[in-house]
Design a protein with these regions (language model features):
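Bacterial N-terminal signal peptides that target proteins for export
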Residues: 1-10
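N-terminal signal peptide c-region/cleavage motif recognized by signal peptidases
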Residues: 16-20
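Ser/Thr-glycine-rich phosphate-binding loops at phosphate-binding pockets of nucleotides
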Residues: 324, 328-329
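Cys-dependent protein tyrosine phosphatase-like superfamily
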Residues: 21-319, 331-412
Length: 412
């Protein structure tokens, strides 16, 4: 090697060493446990069951809880260094699944919606140097996930079921609607008053007659047209998109969704021909009956269709939802979690987590959900899981089907 080449080689080596010497991983500390929930979300999640209902009584605690919504707290990865670009990679351990692989020009990057109670490896590299560290996500339910544009999004996984086995994470997600409901146009308050003046309001069906009686007794109408519920034009276009193209691509990459179980009515899904997540996702449109309605003859037939989707391994990962992710979605989640052996208290916790976005935080919702749980308890069996199995057998599934579903969704 001649002198000039040798000097060049040494300079390059020194530059690489300088990058290495100046990179310092700052946070999280190696081996640290990180949180993915806001403080008030954590307080609710870890509170004794007897204290949980204070968060859903319409008081200040409930308002504070709703102020944070259902968004997860991102894990912030920080380091020191003066390189112009870094490659940051985050892997789930021990399987090594990559959840982030990104080139950045800053000294910080955020990652969210990680599996709970899981060890993660993160690396930062610049030039030929690579520094490695590890952290663990807190064992705190629920696993909130981000789908920017929708809300009330979470993994049903992580909860413990039969034999203390966790429900597998990353297989079944419950959310609010992936697009808006089909629009409905309502008569304004002024238009309703004109209809009453013309003698036409009482001829406009049940809602028109009810509004007519209100006006005759001197009761005031709501200033919000939707609350008066007199339909002028019903479902005339598909619901608006909630996701950008970029967010759809991210959702598919991060969560790998293959199937979308849409529990909304035909009217709500007017004009839709597929999932808002695109053609790679199979859309199962199954109009659902919530709460006690799930146990009627019609409800049983509907449940057979819904849970038939869960029995096909090719359909996973699955997202299921209605529009708010509370009533119909909550009933499906309750039946599935009960079958997997989740304790009743934890099933209630999952349902009431929807209070993070201000739904179900009132007595009527809780009564309706309680009535559905009571209906399930009418089935034979010693435990709630036994009763859920009897319910699934009533739907027409076999014991082998039940066992196969449990093995698919519970960790070994």
């Amino acid at each position: 090697m001649n002198g000039n080449r040798f000097v060049g080689f040494c300079a390059a080596a020194l530059a690489a060493w300088t990058v290495s010497a100046q990179i310092e991983l700052v946070a999280p500390a190696d081996g640290a446990t990180v949180r993915q929930m806001h403080t008030i979300q954590r307080e609710y999640a870890k509170a004794p069951w007897a204290q949980c209902e204070k968060y859903f009584d319409g008081a200040e605690n409930s308002k504070k809880l709703r102020s944070r919504g259902s968004t997860p707290v991102p894990v912030k990865l920080q380091w020191k260094g003066d390189a112009t670009e870094y490659q940051v990679t985050v892997r789930r351990m021990p399987d090594g699944k990559v959840v982030l692989d990104q080139a950045v020009a800053t000294n910080c990057v955020e990652v969210d919606s990680l599996d709970i109670a899981t060890e993660w490896e993160w690396t930062v590299s610049a030039g030929s140097d690579k520094l490695v560290s590890h952290f663990k996500t807190e064992d705190r339910l629920p696993r909130l996930v981000r789908m920017t544009g929708s809300n009330n999004c979470r993994d049903i996984g992580g909860r413990r079921g039969l034999g203390g086995r966790r429900i597998r994470q990353g297989l079944v997600y419950r959310t609010a609607g992936l697009n808006s409901n089909a629009p409905v146009e309502y008569y304004s308050t002024d238009e309703i008053l004109e209809l009453e003046k013309a003698g036409k309001l009482k001829e406009m069906g049940h809602t028109g007659r009810a509004l007519h009686r209100k006006l005759k007794t001197g009761e005031k109408l709501s200033s919000h047209a939707k609350k008066n519920r007199l339909v002028k034009r019903k479902c005339f276009a598909p619901g608006k998109r909630r996701f950008t193209d970029e967010e759809v691509a991210r959702i598919l990459k991060v969560y790998g969704i293959r199937s979308d179980i849409d529990l909304r009515s035909d009217d709500e899904c007017y004009g839709m021909t597929g999932s808002p997540l695109g053609p790679t996702v199979t859309w199962f449109h199954i109009s659902y009956r919530a709460y006690s309605g799930a146990f009627t003859e019609e409800g049983l037939a509907i449940n057979k269709k819904v849970f038939g989707v869960f029995l096909d391994d090719a359909n996973y990962p699955i997202v299921f939802h209605c529009i708010g992710g509370a009533d119909r979605t909550g009933t499906v989640a309750m039946l599935l979690e009960a079958l997997l052996g989740v304790p009743e208290e934890e099933i209630w916790r999952d349902y009431l987590t929807t209070g993070f976005v201000g739904v179900v935080s009132d007595p009527p919702h809780k009564k309706s959900f309680g009535d559905a749980v009571k209906k399930l308890k009418e089935y034979p069996g010693e435990t709630l899981a036994d009763k859920a199995e009897a319910f699934f057998l009533k739907l027409g599934f076999t014991k082998d089907d039940v066992q196969r579903l449990r093995e698919r969704l519970l960790e070994r």
